Amino acid sequence: MDKSESTSAGRNRRRRPRRGSRSASSSADANFRVLSQQLSRLNKTLAAGRPTINHPTFVGSERCRPGYTFTSITLRPPKIDRGSYYGKRLLLPDSVTEYDKKLVSRVQIRVNPLPKFDSTVWVTVRKVLASSDLSVAAISAMFADGASPVLVYQYAASGVQTNNKLLCDLSAMRADIGDMRKYAILVYSKDDALETDELVLHVDIEHQRIPTSRVLPV
């Protein structure tokens, strides 16, 4: 072998990549992608367990349907005797009811226990007759007929039980904002007397967009 051939062979040897270096790099990239995906899933899981700024006792949020927004009202049930009932019609603010033909897609109830709460309540939303006075007998019958989903909320040592919300889909009924006065939130205090300072109900009505927010609290 002459000198030029030896030099060429030397250059070729120097250019040859180190064995396994490329595959090791690809493997590291793949491992990094897997780790990133795992961290992303972990962050989402942890976020579901953290309070939010706007709703400190509730976690996460659900985005409204395209073209929809929501209006929230707050209900504070008065004292309810053991085994008795409370009902309140959904009365929206005038600034919302002026758009009475805007369709309503969902109604969501979020139960917020106050520090003294240590009992069990049943909560639901029902369409009621305009003539109904929401008497104890009338509300009792509506809970008993099984015609609507019921959220059973009970005391949780952590302060808020995991399933603290009830979401009712009204889109198939073509209900509108003007129809909301025909619906009522019903509460049954099953085991104990419920005091006025023990429970707050946040009711979110998702409807076609008017100038408000765009995220539905959960």
From Swiss-Prot:
> Its function?
Capsid protein. Probably binds RNA and plays a role in packaging.
Look up the record and report any one GO term of the cellular component aspect: viral nucleocapsid
GO MF annotation terms: RNA binding; structural molecule activity
Q: Which organism is it from?
A: Cucumber mosaic virus (strain M) (CMV)
> Which named protein is this?
Capsid protein
Q: Where is the composition biased (Low complexity)?
A: 1-10
Q: Is Translocase one of the keywords? A: no
Primary location class: virion
List the InterPro entries hit by this protein, alphabetically. Answer: Cucumovirus_coat, Cucumovirus_coat_Asu_sf
Q: Which ranges are annotated Basic residues under compositional bias? A: 11-21
The protein's location, in the record's own words, is:
Virion
Segment Disordered: which positions? 1-30
Q: Residue positions of the PTM N-acetylmethionine?
A: 1
* UniProt note: domains: The N-terminal arginine-rich stretch does not seem to be the major RNA-binding region that allows formation of an infectious ribonucleoprotein complex.
